[in-house]
């Protein structure tokens, strides 16, 4: 075995950095300085361990080619091997005499005996696996085995290569010959299978079913013989060595240094490639830190690189998360003081671990039957009992396998969630005894603010419940009022007016106090919408009841936007209809746009159940065989009945409505309904009515799409206008006669109300995605890199503009809220999650006002649509001006009404 020799990274320059140590020591003392730099050092060491663990796991699984260390090498070698395979095919095609055993399988994807019997004309139609795919397959298989001592023998590698190519030829024909069927019925299910064995077993069942229906020409696969597989694999190894020099054949050495002629040849990476991969793996391991919270205030941001953490490190933080250093440099000279101030205020907020909640978390996450549904179980759910006649009863076997598959699918997600859960709990325990911790923040390229460490206040309910702000104030009467509102919100009682929320808390005071007194036995709190955040509320509520209104409370209370994307579109367009649906207007009741859409959907469902179309059953003839198979298209009446039986609530429509403002299309809504509602319902036994899941999802997607687009007409108009602008800017303008380029494709640029510049610049990759049936996918070079920027991707520019534009606006609003709340109301503790602003109860009333005041100021002082137009209009060619739709008209929404709306941010 020719293993990688990955040197140990020395991160001592982080822990021993003199300048940051002196600064920290002067301000926070020697111990804090040492601990902070030790944490930053540990972040790199933990990152290194994580990288190497992933590398080891991929090596053991034979997936080394998918590791970041190997991907550039695959990209480099792929065109070289592709050319060598093409050359060999041409050489053999032109050679006289009998073809080698490997020729027909490699050239045409069929066994030699079958190829000879086919005849030349028929054989021409058998294109086989492409040289590009064969090259990728060969590199992935060989790299996957070169590090595994029991798999690196030449015969073993050759055999695996031959089998892999046969599988690609055999099952790849399904994708090629029956593309529509594969995409609709096979692709997603194949991706859900983990491991080659399960994927192949699934595809064998698919193949048999298709052949029984007269598809694939009705022909069974003519298997390659074992020796033929060996010939194919050996030839591919030879071509790999000739074309790339990636591997070499070696034998074990005798004591005198000579080859052991009795041993089998080994396939080993050539020394030059071992060194190359080792260096790259070592470098990557050294720049993959697992960032953690700080035990001193983070380093303030004063420029675009180097804030947050105090040591420089191998990979200093950037203020803006961009795809390249070149993109980051654009921000270097930008004057945006409010942006810097907002991010610094966010990360200068001290937090601490909520020890009371953590004590409960430490116990409850290890219960076999945890009452909190979102806590991933310790063990896999038990498989359904196997039928006694499973070996002889085909119907019973299929039913059992379907139920078992659902268990395995859920368990895959459980394992991933469990790992994240255990990491978060470990981090909370690690920092539990610190009086204060801080979280460095930066932004994505649209200006949305993110915490950097994996453990942070923007996490799930358990993580948020396990953290609280470090600086509190006496809660007072007003703060106690907002604490009650927060408690009701955490319980899911957030779609009713404030008095009803207060009433819910007061009526359940006994349950709240009992939960606080003994949460492990009094588990009423686990039934609430956000159980851990609600438990944190219970402890604080009990504290106020015990100590009175002078109780020092630091629990963060959040004011969330009501479908913020549509709120921003409605405000910028003064749309009173959409604005009312998302609570921008004063009202005695809470407007729930998700329920509004659900109600409209239910109206149509009841109509369709009575007057809808009927199911159609067609006999479809196979184009090649002429055989018929049945196609069932469920009618509206049947689909409506299924959904009425299941029940369409706001939960079904929420994600689809929420993402409309972020550019989702009907096809995405269909996928969301399938993933969020139908598949989970089928898995837990509540979705048995969905006999045709894809049809049910498509039907519901159309109903939701139709309902939401008539509810927020102005938002849809704005999104379409933005797409038109992006499409024109991304278009290349040529002279019709001379074909001279009059205007190149342009990226899009705009500036948010608080001065943050946004560049949307999606470019086409000089690569293509090559996907194998079983061995995954990879980017492969289509052209050699010239060092110049690639062409603007017009499709991505158009589809991305609506979500990116509105995300930039809510990011700006959040930052402006932070600065305004600090400057006007003196608030200095912030809990921020995109469209949610929070602070301690004593300051909550002022933040309630601040978030509304900045929303009004944003759109009173800025016509963001007109400003956007002004920033790109000069870039349009004169021939495009008449193609640009007029700027959307404004409605009659009075922005000042937002100040009086209780529920706009609540």
UniProtKB/Swiss-Prot annotation:
Methyltransferase keyword on record: no
EC number(s) reported in the record: 2.7.7.6
GO biological process entries: DNA-templated transcription; viral transcription
Highest taxon of source: Viruses
One Pfam family of this chain: RNA_pol
InterPro entries, A to Z: DNA-dir_RNA_pol_helix_hairp_sf (IPR024075), DNA-dir_Rpol_C_phage-type (IPR046950), DNA-dir_Rpol_phage-type (IPR002092), DNA/RNA_pol_sf (IPR043502), RNA_POL_N_sf (IPR037159), RPOL_N (IPR029262)
Catalytic activity: RNA(n) + a ribonucleoside 5'-triphosphate = RNA(n+1) + diphosphate
Active site: 560, 654, 835
GO MF annotation, one: DNA-directed RNA polymerase activity
Keyword Metal-binding: no
Function text: DNA-dependent RNA polymerase catalyzes the transcription of DNA into RNA using the four ribonucleoside triphosphates as substrates.
Protein name as annotated: DNA-directed RNA polymerase
């Amino acid at each position: 075995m020719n293993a990688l020799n990955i040197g140990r990274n020395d991160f001592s320059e982080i822990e021993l950095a003199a300048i940051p140590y002196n600064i920290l020591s002067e301000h926070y003392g020697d111990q804090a300085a040492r601990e902070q730099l030790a944490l930053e050092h540990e972040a790199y060491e933990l990152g290194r361990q994580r990288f190497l663990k992933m590398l080891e796991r991929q090596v053991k699984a034979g997936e080394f080619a998918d590791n970041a260390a190997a991907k550039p090498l695959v990209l480099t070698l792929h065109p070289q091997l592709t050319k060598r395979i093409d050359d060999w095919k041409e050489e053999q095609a032109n050679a006289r005499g009998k073809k080698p055993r490997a020729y027909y399988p490699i050239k045409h994807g069929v066994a030699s005996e079958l190829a000879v019997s086919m005849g030349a004309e028929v054989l021409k139609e058998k294109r086989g696996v492409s040289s590009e795919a064969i090259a990728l397959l060969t590199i992935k298989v060989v790299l996957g085995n070169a590090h595994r001592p029991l798999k690196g023998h030449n015969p073993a590698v050759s055999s695996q290569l031959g089998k892999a190519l046969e599988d690609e030829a055999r099952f790849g024909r399904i994708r090629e010959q029956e593309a529509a069927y594969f995409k609709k019925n096979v692709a997603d299910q194949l991706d859900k299978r983990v491991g080659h064995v399960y994927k192949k077993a699934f595809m064998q069942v698919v193949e048999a079913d298709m052949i029984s229906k007269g598809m694939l020409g009705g022909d069974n696969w003519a298997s390659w013989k074992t020796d033929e597989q060996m010939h194919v694999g050996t030839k591919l190894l030879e071509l790999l060595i000739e074309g790339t020099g990636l591997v070499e054949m070696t034998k074990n050495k005798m004591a005198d240094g000579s080859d052991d002629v009795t041993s089998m040849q080994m396939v080993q990476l050539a020394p030059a490639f071992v060194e190359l991969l080792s260096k790259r793996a070592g470098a990557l391991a050294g720049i993959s830190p697992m960032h953690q919270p700080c035990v001193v205030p983070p380093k303030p941001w004063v420029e675009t690189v180097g804030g947050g953490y105090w040591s420089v490190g191998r990979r200093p933080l950037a203020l803006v998360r961009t795809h390249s250093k070149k993109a980051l440099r654009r921000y270097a000279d930008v004057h945006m003081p409010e942006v810097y101030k907002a991010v610094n205020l966010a990360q200068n907020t001290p937090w601490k671990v909520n020890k009371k909640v953590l004590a409960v978390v430490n116990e409850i996450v290890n219960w076999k039957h945890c009452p909190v549904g979102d806590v991933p179980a310790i063990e896999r759910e038990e498989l359904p009992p196997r039928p006694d006649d499973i070996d002889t009863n085909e119907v019973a076997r299929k039913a059992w396998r379907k139920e078992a598959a659902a268990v395995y699918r859920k368990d895959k997600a459980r394992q991933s969630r469990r790992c994240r859960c255990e990491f978060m709990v470990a981090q909370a325990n690690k920092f539990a005894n610190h009086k204060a911790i801080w979280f460095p923040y930066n932004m994505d390229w649209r200006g949305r603010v993110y915490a950097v460490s994996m453990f942070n206040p923007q996490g799930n309910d358990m993580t948020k419940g396990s953290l609280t702000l470090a600086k509190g104030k006496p809660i007072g009467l007003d703060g106690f009022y907002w604490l009650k509102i927060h408690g009701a919100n955490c319980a899911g009682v957030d779609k009713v007016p404030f008095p009803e929320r207060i009433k819910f808390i007061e009526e359940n005071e006994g349950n709240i106090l009992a939960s606080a007194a003994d949460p492990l036995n009094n588990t009423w709190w686990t039934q609430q919408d956000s159980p851990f955040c609600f438990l944190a509320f219970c402890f604080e509520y009990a504290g106020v009841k015990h100590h009175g209104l002078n109780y020092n409370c630091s629990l963060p209370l959040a004011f969330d936007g009501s479908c913020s994307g549509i709120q921003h579109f409605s405000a910028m367009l003064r749309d009173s209809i959409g604005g009312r649906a998302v609570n921008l207007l004063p009202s005695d009741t809470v407007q729930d746009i998700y329920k509004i859409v659900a109600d409209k959907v239910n109206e149509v469902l009841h109509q369709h159940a009575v007057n809808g179309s009927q199911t159609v059953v067609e006999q479809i003839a196979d184009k090649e065989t002429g055989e018929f198979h049945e196609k069932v298209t469920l009618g509206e009446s049947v689909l409506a009945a299924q959904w009425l039986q299941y029940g369409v609530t706001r939960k079904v429509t929420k994600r689809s409505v929420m993402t409309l403002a972020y550019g989702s299309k009907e096809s995405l809504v269909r996928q969301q309904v399938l993933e969020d509602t139908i598949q989970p319902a089928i898995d837990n036994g509540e979705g048995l009515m969905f006999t045709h899941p894809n049809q049910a999802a498509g039907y519901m997607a159309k109903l939701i799409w139709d309902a939401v687009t008539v509810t927020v007409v102005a938002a849809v108009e704005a999104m379409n206008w933005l797409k038109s602008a992006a499409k024109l800017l991304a278009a290349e303008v040529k002279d019709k006669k001379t074909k001279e380029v009059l205007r190149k494709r342009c990226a899009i640029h705009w500036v948010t109300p608080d001065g943050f510049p946004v560049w949307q610049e999606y470019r086409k990759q000089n690569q293509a995605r090559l996907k194998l049936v079983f061995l995954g996918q990879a980017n492969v070079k289509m052209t050699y890199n010239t060092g110049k920027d690639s062409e603007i991707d017009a499709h991505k520019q158009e589809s991305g503009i609506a979500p990116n534009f509105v995300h930039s606006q809510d990011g700006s609003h959040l930052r402006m809220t932070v600065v305004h709340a600090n400057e006007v109301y003196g608030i200095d503790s912030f809990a921020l999650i995109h469209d949610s602003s929070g602070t301690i109860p004593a300051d909550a009333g002022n933040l309630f006002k601040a978030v509304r005041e900045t929303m009004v100021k944003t759109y009173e002082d800025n016509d963001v649509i007109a400003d956007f137009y002004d920033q790109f209009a000069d870039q349009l060619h004169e021939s495009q001006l008449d193609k640009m739709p007029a700027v959307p008209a404004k409605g009659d929404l009075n922005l000042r009404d937002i100040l009086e709306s209780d529920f706009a941010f609540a």
